[in-house]
Swiss-Prot record:
This is Chemotaxis protein CheY. One of its GO terms (biological process) is phosphorelay signal transduction system. Its cofactor is Mg(2+). It is found in: Cytoplasm. One of its GO terms (molecular function) is metal ion binding. Phosphorylated by CheA. One of its GO terms (cellular component) is cytoplasm. Mg(2+) binds at D8, D9, D53, T55. Binds 1 Mg(2+) ion per subunit. The modification 4-aspartylphosphate is found at D53.
């Protein structure tokens, strides 16, 4: 089982991802509601993959991505956002994200991104 950290300020989005992965090779080991929590939880649980929302309070996902990548350049992070603007996608990939999922997302797309990042 690969360990997954889910980061989103919306509980229903975290629950949706948990439901999508419940019968897969991914185990949710931690959740966070903002970027500050994400960085802390990343250090605590050392997940294999992180799903990371962009728009969150306290610290946004792009800043959390930068901090995680600075600590662990091999981190596997998948960005999730309702804002699929090309510039934001490019920025996330340049900062080290392995993939970008636009909300609302489909189960197949989430699993595809996770499996791709796991390789």
């Amino acid at each position: 089982m690969l360990k997954l950290l889910i980061v989103d300020d919306a509980m229903f989005m975290r629950t949706m991802i948990k439901n999508i992965v419940k019968d897969s090779d991914f185990e949710v080991v931690a959740e966070a509601e903002n970027g500050l929590e994400a960085v802390k939880k990343y250090d605590e649980v050392k997940p294999d993959i992180v799903t990371l929302d962009i728009t969150m309070p306290e610290m946004d996902g792009l800043e959390a991505l930068a901090q995680i990548m600075a600590k662990d350049p091999s981190a596997k992070v998948i960005m999730c956002s309702a804002m699929g603007q090309q510039g934001m996608v490019v920025d996330a990939i340049k900062k080290g994200a392995k993939d970008f999922i636009v909300k609302p997302f489909q189960a197949d797309r989430v699993l595809e991104a996770l499996e791709k990042a796991a390789k």
